[in-house]
Amino acid sequence: MLVWLNGQFVPPDQAVLSVFDAGLQHGVGLFETMAARGGSVFRAQAHVRRLADSARELLLTDRLHVEPLVEAVAQVAARGDLDNARIRLTLTGGNLNLLQSQGADKVDPTILIVAQPATVYPDVYFERGVTMLITDGRQNPFDPMAGHKTLNYWPRIQALQQAASKRAGEALWLTVSNHLASGSVSNVFLVRDETLHTPFARGEEEPGALPSPVLPGITRAAIIATADQMGIETKKHMLDIEDLLGADEVFLTNSSWGVLSVVGVEQKKIGEGTPGEITKRLRAAWLELVEKETSED
């Protein structure tokens, strides 16, 4: 494990945050999880830019500089000396006690980067696919935090725990209007008639439509671009349970899994109940893309 805290590398057992840090006191913060191979990070700039955009939009800070932070992420990954790593970038509102003790009108955010060995999922996970459980919670498009990767993951973790208790690999969230949103830690795609379908993400909505609570995933964007290069069309629109259950294939995307097939939703089988051909092609293409981009650095 390697830790970088506020501009300095520190031993993990000496990495200390103030008890007055906004992330601890109020859950004020954002994070990014990135995949690294051989010391190179996949799409680091896209991840850091998303975090900086969210920080500005949510009034956390407008003083983040993307390029130096991308360089810090790269240094952590390189010095971590891990063939397959998970890089976690965390940004909080900083030490709020300084506002009172120093009379400051702003405080510097806390920036933490940690490199750890990536979780290794068994091959059978991808060969057989997983099932999903529909969570009881709903994503609210009017929540100003919706569609941003904030530190408040408690509802999502709780949903994942509920899914795991039913031997499901992911928990599916719907919106308050009962349209598909996303998994707890993933974006969702449907395949129907050899076309990809995925819910609108934040910033992709049609004019006049409700805001989308869906995170614009970095892997999601990579898969949409890859599919286009393969001649596979992607349609972004509102989807419901009937669309999901009637799909030929369903798969999930995130930085850890890449592409993961969904073969069932609770008791309902998706397609043939096995990973579909388009899903398998896209997973293979994603693995090649990660290998290519992390080998070029």
Tell what function each PLM region has.
Residues 1-172, 176-179, 211, 224-297:
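Conserved alpha/beta cores of soluble small-molecule-handling proteins
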